[in-house]
């Protein structure tokens, strides 16, 4: 049986012992930076005692059997099958290493009964140490699967330790998400209100109103927003960050050589600024040869291409310097290589360097598609996107560049593989840079609303993700995939989901009524707050002149024992 697939070679896992059960004891939600980045001499021992598919190689010697990927790409071993059930989520993890070679991809693949291959996750493995491979599957069927390792190395020998598979119900997965959200998106704050003599003020009311959230769920916009008052009203009442789908792109601002026109982009930016909406820059350049201005496509002289490209970078970045939260510098530069073919292998990295010099305070993104949304992706996989950013940062002069990862998120109309998404975000997050989902959408399908909610909650519950922008809007906007409202601006089901999440991820205004006890010298009231900026007012229901207000920023860096002390002048 030939097992060559997209240049990878499959090796079936031979299971000496296995068990699949439900529960939440295994933790795919663990985001230890060291585990996700380090190659260790000896993997940590698993704390799991039951409910696992488990297989390990001995760490004491090299005499144990290894999984060998035949030079001809043939499967050589029979596997014990695992029964999966539709509606559940299965997380996978294993410590892997190679007998020979370094920095080679090793992945996990699930093969269904009809031969379909579902890729579940990947990692770069080495021969001298063990690397953690994470992933999983959300089956759209009930039935058996065979589990494989895959490698880009013909004839590779793979060893694995602590191979674990865990089954979660959707309710269990959601519970883990919620627990993590409470941990990573909120901090506990204690208020202590005293007089100048340090005695507690009894019965005060502490009012809290969030003025700015640290995590933003935004939406793309296009030129039609300038033509529709209803669209503008709909947008401004919901979103605090946006990106323009086309209006800042080179082919939109310089349709003829030397004739720049930023009128539309400037007008859209003014609308955003007037309504307190932040803007993400999209995009300085695009590496897709088909997406260059028509006149650029006709230039054959590399020196001339370099001249017009440098002019473009300087023009757009200097024009909007200090006005944007980030820039996609060379869009989709793993899938495409127009500038590399015309100008050399270091074209992208050098353009990031120029962008950094022009605006050193703005986040500069590598922005790619299929990185988290398509398990079959071969070109812009999480480990390849990570490597691209590492190469950019390693370019001379880029050491202190504020890098970031943009995962576009153009999902297909099927159940998203949440376990794979989480493992992909783990890989990207191991860089320690912010991740944004930048263009989330999905074709219309019966379960679109639920699928979109699943995706957004998965991203929100990952600590490396700092914001999300969806590509959708009301019918008048022309977004034909993610339509959030009809022509009369009445919500669709997916629009209801977005409004629900916007409300849920914004801290509700609240009042804390302190206890009216008289036997305590110090009163502290504790509240769990979403990260962001707040206006705080302290008052007393029957002491008219006892009132004070101040601003407070709640951050993840806050000490969990953080006490906000408010001193009232008598």
From Swiss-Prot:
Q: Which residues form the GH10 domain?
A: 202-501
Q: Which GO terms describe its biological process?
A: xylan catabolic process
* Presence of keyword rRNA-binding: no
The reply to whether Magnesium figures as a keyword in the UniProt entry is: no
Cross-referenced Pfam families, in alphabetical order? Glyco_hydro_10
The active site annotation covers: 332 (proton donor), 439 (nucleophile)
Top EC class of this enzyme: hydrolase
Q: InterPro entries under this entry?
A: GH10 (IPR044846), GH10_dom (IPR001000), Glycoside_hydrolase_SF (IPR017853)
* Pathway as given in its UniProt record: Glycan degradation; xylan degradation
Q: Which GO terms describe its molecular function?
A: endo-1,4-beta-xylanase activity
- EC assignment: the record states 3.2.1.8
Q: Which UniProt keywords apply?
A: Carbohydrate metabolism, Glycoprotein, Glycosidase, Hydrolase, Polysaccharide degradation, Signal, Xylan degradation
Q: Which residues form a coiled coil?
A: none
Q: What residue stretch is flagged as signal peptide? A: 1-23
What residues bear carbohydrate chains? 197, 261, 307, 346, 490, 515, 537, 545
- Top-level lineage group: Eukaryota
Q: Which reaction does it catalyse?
A: Endohydrolysis of (1->4)-beta-D-xylosidic linkages in xylans
As for family, the record states: Belongs to the glycosyl hydrolase 10 (cellulase F) family.
Q: What does this protein do?
A: Binds to and hydrolyzes insoluble and soluble xylan substrates.
**Comment field on protein domains:** The GH10 domain binds to xylan.
Put simply, this protein is called Endo-1,4-beta-xylanase 5-like
In its UniProt entry, the species of origin is given as: Arabidopsis thaliana
């Amino acid at each position: 049986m030939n097992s060559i697939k997209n240049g990878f070679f499959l090796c079936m896992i031979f299971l000496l012992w296995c068990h699949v059960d439900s529960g939440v004891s295994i933790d795919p939600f663990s985001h230890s930076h060291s585990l996700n980045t380090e190659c260790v001499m000896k993997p940590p021992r698993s704390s799991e005692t039951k409910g696992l598919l488990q297989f390990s190689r001995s760490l004491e010697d090299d005499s144990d059997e290894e999984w060998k990927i035949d030079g001809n790409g043939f499967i050589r071993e029979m596997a014990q099958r695992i029964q999966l059930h539709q509606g559940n989520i299965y997380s996978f993890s294993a410590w892997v290493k190679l007998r020979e070679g370094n920095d080679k991809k090793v992945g996990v693949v699930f093969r269904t009964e009809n031969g379909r291959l579902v890729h579940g996750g990947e990692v770069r493995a080495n021969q001298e140490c063990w690397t953690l491979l994470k992933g999983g599957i959300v089956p759209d069927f009930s039935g058996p699967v065979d589990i494989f390792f895959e490698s880009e190395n013909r004839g590779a020998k793979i060893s694995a330790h602590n191979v674990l598979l865990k089954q979660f119900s959707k309710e269990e997965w959601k519970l883990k998400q919620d627990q993590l959200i409470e941990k990573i998106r909120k901090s506990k704050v204690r208020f202590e209100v005293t007089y100048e003599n340090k005695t507690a003020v009894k019965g005060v009311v502490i009012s809290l109103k969030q003025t700015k959230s640290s995590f933003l769920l935004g939406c793309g916009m296009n030129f039609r927003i300038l033509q529709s008052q209803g669209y503008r009203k709909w947008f401004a009442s919901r979103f605090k960050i946006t990106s323009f789908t086309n209006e800042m792109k080179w082919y939109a601002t310089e349709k003829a050589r030397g004739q720049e026109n930023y009128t539309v982009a400037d007008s859209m930016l003014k609308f955003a600024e007037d309504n307190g909406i932040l803007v993400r820059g999209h995009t300085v350049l695009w590496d897709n040869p088909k997406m260059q201005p028509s006149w650029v496509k006709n230039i054959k002289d590399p020196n001339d291409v370099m001249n017009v490209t440098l002019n473009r970078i300087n023009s757009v970045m200097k024009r909007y310097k200090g006005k944007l939260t980030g820039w996609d510098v060379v869009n989709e530069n793993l899938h495409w290589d127009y500038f590399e073919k015309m100008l050399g292998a270091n074209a992208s990295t050098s353009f990031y360097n120029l962008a950094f010099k022009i605006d050193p305070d703005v986040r500069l993104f590598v922005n790619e598609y299929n990185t988290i949304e398509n398990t079959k992706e071969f070109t812009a996989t999480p480990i390849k996107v990570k490597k691209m950013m590492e190469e950019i940062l390693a370019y001379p002069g880029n050491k202190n560049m504020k890098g970031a990862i943009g995962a576009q998120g153009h999902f297909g109309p099927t159940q998203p593989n949440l376990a794979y998404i989480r493992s992909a975000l783990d890989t990207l997050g191991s860089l320690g840079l912010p991740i944004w989902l930048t263009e989330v959408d999905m074709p219309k399908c019966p379960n679109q609303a639920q699928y979109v909610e699943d995706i957004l909650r998965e991203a929100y519950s990952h600590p490396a993700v700092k914001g999300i922008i969806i590509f959708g809007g009301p019918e008048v906007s022309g977004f034909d995939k993610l339509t959030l409202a009809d022509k009369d601006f009445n919500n669709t089901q997916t629009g209801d989901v977005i409004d629900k999440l916007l409300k849920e991820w914004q801290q509700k205004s609240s009042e804390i009524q302190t206890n009216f006890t008289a036997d305590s010298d110090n009163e502290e009231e504790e509240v769990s707050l979403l990260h962001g900026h707040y206006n705080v007012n302290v008052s007393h229901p029957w002491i008219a002149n006892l009132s004070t207000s101040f601003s407070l920023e709640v951050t993840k860096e806050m000490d969990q024992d953080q006490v906000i002390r408010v001193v009232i002048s008598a």
